[in-house]
Regions:
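Short, basic/aromatic recognition patches
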Residues: 1-7
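Conserved acyl-donor/pantetheine-binding loop and adjacent beta-alpha core of acyl/acetyltransferases
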Residues: 31-72, 110-135, 153-197
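Conserved beta-strand in the GNAT
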Residues: 18, 25-35, 69, 74, ...
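Conserved acetyl-CoA-binding loop-helix of GNAT-fold acetyltransferases
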Residues: 75, 81-98, 103-106
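ATP phosphate-binding glycine-rich loop and adjacent ATP-lid/helix-beta elements
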Residues: 139
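A short helix-loop-beta-strand connector motif used in the catalytic cores of GNAT acetyltransferases and
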Residues: 7-18, 36-42, 134, 198-205
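C-terminal/domain-terminus segments
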Residues: 4, 87-95, 99, 152-187, ...
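Conserved acetyl-CoA-binding loop of GNAT-fold acetyltransferases
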Residues: 143-151
């Protein structure tokens, strides 16, 4: 996937954008997206989520794009919680509209899911605050912009590596085969020492934003 993501940056730079802090003269946010083909049927959104969106776009004969698929928004820690994420999503949707792609879809990575790695993602999605808004702040931000939670992308990101690599990445000893909860992961990883392999299969959440239309003055 790292190879394909490099192609996203190189071949779809028009869908890459930044948030800039004039006072500090530095980038404080980055957003990237990719055109995608989707027929509007919620059932056809792929379980592969993030990975599937890139694989489909770089297939030998990709289908003509009909929507814009968000791949990620990253905001500097000191600028989080100030409304920038909302503005970044809105800007992403505007860029899509400017290229004839009025609908934004997103395989969203829930911000707080890593605190509940043993909770099934479907159950996590049912958690709401007393005011009815979603417990997860990133899902909540998308919902406030009109997006619907459509389905779970159960295999959105798959990461494999040797046991040694996983011990390096997690800064943990993984002495035997089995399932481990590791820092930052939304779900546990699975270690197979006989095969010298660790696998992480991350679920994300497909969300669909309503078509963005131009408002006449």
């Amino acid at each position: 996937m790292k190879r394909l993501f490099g192609r996203v940056v190189a071949e779809y730079a028009e869908f890459l954008f930044y948030a800039w802090d004039d006072e500090r003269q530095e980038v404080i946010g980055v957003g990237h997206a990719i055109p995608a083909a989707w027929d509007g049927d919620r059932a056809t959104l792929p379980d592969g989520g993030f990975d599937a969106a890139m694989e489909a776009r770089f297939a030998p004969e990709p289908s003509a794009p009909t929507v814009l698929c968000a791949l990620g928004i990253t905001i500097a820690p000191e600028h989080r919680g100030q409304g920038l994420s909302r503005r970044m999503i809105e800007r992403m949707a505007e860029i899509g509209r400017d290229h004839g792609l009025d609908t934004l879809i997103a395989p969203v990575r829930p911000t707080l899911k890593h605190r509940y790695p043993l909770t099934p993602i479907d159950r996590y999605l049912s958690w709401r605050r007393p005011d009815g808004t979603h417990l997860d702040p990133w899902l909540r931000t998308h919902e406030r912009l009109g997006a619907d939670i459509v389905k779970v992308a159960s295999k959105s990101v798959i990461v494999t590596g040797t046991v040694a690599k996983w011990e390096e990445w997690t800064e943990m000893a993984l002495p035997e085969s089995g399932v481990y909860v590791v820092p930052g992961a939304l779900v546990p990883i699975e270690i197979d020492r006989e095969r010298d392999e660790g696998v992480y299969v991350e679920p994300n959440v497909w969300m669909v934003h309503p078509p963005l239309r131009v408002t006449e003055p």
